[in-house]
């Protein structure tokens, strides 16, 4: 079964690129948003402390504050990048997730999309999905990268996106350390001899990291290593570990011991978050996140057999979707309206 791709024409230049791009890929009836912004200091403290800027638990939201997607369902795009000391945001996305909530049933879920999944990027043809943020940023629009990613997901998966949150993973370390570390139940031994460890004298240096099974306390550096390592297992296992780490961050952030740490968390957040959500929407998310029962959140990774490995003519290794297998998963997570 092949999904029909709805591909808009290439974006034009100018300040309205983001709205034009999203409007072309969005189905009738979905709302529009303004450009990216940073949370104010006081609000960032609340948002970060509740884990909202980091994970797919951005799901229990007052429905009146967010536009409707599929039959009132709310879908948020969650992105992680590694700026490696840079100041811009035009980098390939290292983590791509879609968080979803049905406000009527309170059913929630997180979909992890592999960064090497090849899809049609509106206006740019077939390429890995993690390149969309770079292509969109080439339009001289700071909000263009996430806009193109949203359009790509909408065009290929038929999932309307209501907003995005993007975080720099280097600040992720600081956030975990500010929380005093997190507890992770490591299920499988992990040994990676080629974990990237760039240095000024050798930007391509590696180091060895190792995790034994069992409950472990991790600081920011260890948590990031555990979430991002891919050489000893697979990119799909990596996506599952990322979801576990994000759940652990939320658990710690919601603890009473985290309350005195909120001001410092806010300071870390100011330079590490981009979002197109309005201030009142962020506040609604923060106030509602604590009510979510994390044990009931569906966690899905697009992995084999939902996708299969392929080598392109240029030698690049990518993953290709099996829509006949993916569609039932999307229906279960997002509702029947996503399959047309």
Predicted regions and their residues:
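Non-catalytic, solvent-exposed segments at the cell envelope interface
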Residues: 2-340
């Amino acid at each position: 079964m092949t999904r029909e791709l709805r591909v808009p024409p290439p974006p034009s230049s100018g300040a309205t690129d983001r709205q034009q791009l999203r409007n072309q890929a969005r189905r009738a009836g979905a709302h529009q948003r303004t450009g990216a912004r940073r949370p104010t200091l006081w609000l960032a403290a609340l948002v970060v402390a509740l884990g909202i800027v980091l994970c797919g638990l951005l799901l229990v939201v007052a429905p009146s504050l967010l536009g409707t997607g599929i039959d009132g369902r709310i879908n948020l795009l969650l992105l992680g990048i590694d700026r490696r000391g840079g100041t811009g945001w035009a980098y390939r996305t290292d983590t791509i997730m879609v968080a979803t909530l049905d406000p009527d049933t309170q059913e929630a879920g997180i979909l992890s999309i592999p960064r090497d999944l090849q899809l049609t990027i509106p206006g740019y043809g077939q390429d890995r999905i993690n390149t969309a943020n770079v292509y969109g940023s080439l339009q001289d629009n700071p909000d263009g990268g996430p806009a193109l990613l949203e359009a790509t997901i909408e065009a290929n998966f038929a999932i309307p996106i209501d907003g995005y949150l993007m975080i720099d993973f280097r600040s992720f370390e600081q956030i975990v350390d500010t929380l005093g570390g997190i507890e992770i139940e490591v299920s499988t031994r992990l040994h990676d001899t080629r974990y990237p460890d760039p240095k000024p004298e050798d930007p391509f240096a590696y180091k060895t990291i190792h995790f034994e099974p069992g409950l472990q306390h991790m600081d920011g550096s260890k948590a990031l290593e555990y979430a991002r390592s891919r050489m000893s297992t697979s990119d799909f296992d990596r996506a599952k570990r990322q979801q576990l780490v994000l759940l652990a961050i939320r658990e710690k952030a919601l603890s009473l011991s985290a309350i005195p740490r909120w001001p410092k968390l806010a300071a870390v957040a100011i330079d590490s978050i981009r979002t197109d959500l309005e201030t009142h929407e962020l506040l609604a998310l923060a106030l509602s996140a604590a009510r979510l029962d994390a044990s009931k959140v569906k966690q899905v990774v697009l992995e084999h057999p939902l996708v299969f490995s392929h080598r392109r003519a240029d030698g690049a290794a990518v993953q290709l979707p099996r829509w006949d297998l993916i569609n039932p998963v999307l229906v279960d997570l997002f509702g029947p309206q996503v399959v047309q």
